[in-house]
Amino acid sequence: MATEKQQDNWIKEGRGQGYLKNYKPWVTVRDFGSKGRSHRVYGHTTKRTHHLLSDLELATFLLLDWNPSVTDIREQFPLPLQATTQIAEQAQITHPRVRNALQIMSSDFYVDRKDFRQPNFA
């Protein structure tokens, strides 16, 4: 979880923005200490290093990276704060906060594909 100041800095850094080799993940393996395993892996599809926070993310990434229909892989993709607060409100659950600052949540992956029927998925 990040403080409001950290989140503001990440936005200024351009995290969660860009495509292919210019994409910057919202969260990197260096941002937080972890009790689990994290990985920094080069992606052949995107031509950049990906920040993966678990072995399961690594396994998923490897399947995506070698799939010929995948055109872009963005990991730790930030979700719109307005949308996640609305979902939490509708579900009557508390949206994550740190020091009373709402947290920008992220999806493990946001993937673009050549398939016109389902060109994107998270």
Q: Model features per residue range: what roles?
A:
Residues 75-119:
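Active-site metal-binding core of divalent-cation-utilizing nuclease and nuclease-like domains
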Residues 1-81:
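A structured, charge-rich N-terminal accessory region that forms the first stable segment of a protein
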